[in-house]
Amino acid sequence: MAIAQLATEYVFSDFLLKEPTEPKFKGLRLELAVDKMVTCIAVGLPLLLISLAFAQEISIGTQISCFSPSSFSWRQAAFVDSYCWAAVQQKNSLQSESGNLPLWLHKFFPYILLLFAILLYLPPLFWRFAAAPHICSDLKFIMEELDKVYNRAIKAAKSARDLDMRDGACSVPGVTENLGQSLWEVSESHFKYPIVEQYLKTKKNSNNLIIKYISCRLLTLIIILLACIYLGYYFSLSSLSDEFVCSIKSGILRNDSTVPDQFQCKLIAVGIFQLLSVINLVVYVLLAPVVVYTLFVPFRQKTDVLKVYEILPTFDVLHFKSEGYNDLSLYNLFLEENISEVKSYKCLKVLENIKSSGQGIDPMLLLTNLGMIKMDVVDGKTPMSAEMREEQGNQTAELQGMNIDSETKANNGEKNARQRLLDSSC
């Protein structure tokens, strides 16, 4: 019964899809380094300046100071300050020394910076939800296939070495010829139709991801230019005047002779806002050329990452470059960004350095001495250690011993029953 249960467990375990113990590629970067830098600066700087503006407001306690008559109590002076601060956005209640100016921009300056920060975060947010999942799945497939290509090359190199060793050991010509032909077929089968190469070539005719990428970069550039225009206009506005005249004669105070017709008011935070606008403007002006550079990054047509794989026979025909803007140019950039996750690249980079040193060493000969990259985790199977194999062997031996003991006891029981029957008949 125990043997049948163990056999059933082994049979059904082959049909079950086991979950991988840990992900093969952890921490894939789905955003280019230059794009992430632009996002952090463009979004983080306004938020930092907003925090400074609100800290200044908390420390000072008021954003406006109106010069009330000495006969006014502190409550009446506070009412004048509150009334004129609330009337900043009303053009008919305010009159500046330089004419009618939109002084409400001073009041809403921190909130406009917050608006630009939100707008600049929208393109990365769109990229994260619209394009990043597709790129993540494709990158995992491509990097996994690159490791498999490396493993196939090692198998082929070792099979060729075994062929040479058997040629020296075998003296029968017919057997040697048949063996060499079979090994050559196995080696050649490793190099037929590399799927990763064919898959990358299909991306030359695809423009879906590159359109999303260029759209996000263009939208970021437009928002930064609009922010620069606003900050420049605000700086020129704040440099004209931060003082204005306010009238509170309305309602029941219209005919009150004790209330002055006009009050001279001054916006206290304009100087701080002017400094913050200059800082933000300078940073955005310096950031705009970087955003323009990101538009032309996919046009570089770099395939340096895959060039190291040309050492392998599988990649002898991998001599293609992206022409213009297409998804292939974008995948090359993201492969370069995540190349540290590809183990086969590190091994082949060592072989390339040895080959370029001019020592005359055949890279294919070195492949026979390299270890294969474990792909069991990707397939959902964990490699069985020696201790687990020994434990399973012990369990099998115990089950066999239990089976033998049960058969021995059954035979002894039958013999005892026969003996009792013979004794009773006598």
Swiss-Prot record:
Statement: the UniProt record of this protein carries the keyword Acyltransferase: no
Annotated phenotype, changing K346E: In OZEMA7; impaired glycosylation resulting in the absence of GLY2 and the accumulation of GLY1 forms; results in increased hemi-channel activity
Modified residues (Phosphotyrosine): Y199
Reactions it catalyzes: chloride(in) = chloride(out); iodide(out) = iodide(in); ATP(in) = ATP(out); K(+)(in) = K(+)(out)
Disordered: annotated segments: 405-426
Alphabetized UniProt keyword annotations: Calcium, Calcium channel, Calcium transport, Cell membrane, Differentiation, Disease variant, Disulfide bond, Endoplasmic reticulum, Glycoprotein, Ion channel, Ion transport, Membrane, Oogenesis, Phosphoprotein, S-nitrosylation, Transmembrane, Transmembrane helix, Transport
Impact noted for substituting N338Q: Impaired glycosylation; loss of GLY2 form; oocyte death
Biased composition range(s): Basic and acidic residues: 415-426
Matches recorded under PROSITE patterns: PANNEXIN
Similarity comment text for this entry: Belongs to the pannexin family.
PANTHER family (alphabetical): PANNEXIN, PANNEXIN-1
Assembly: Homoheptameric.
Protein name: Pannexin-1
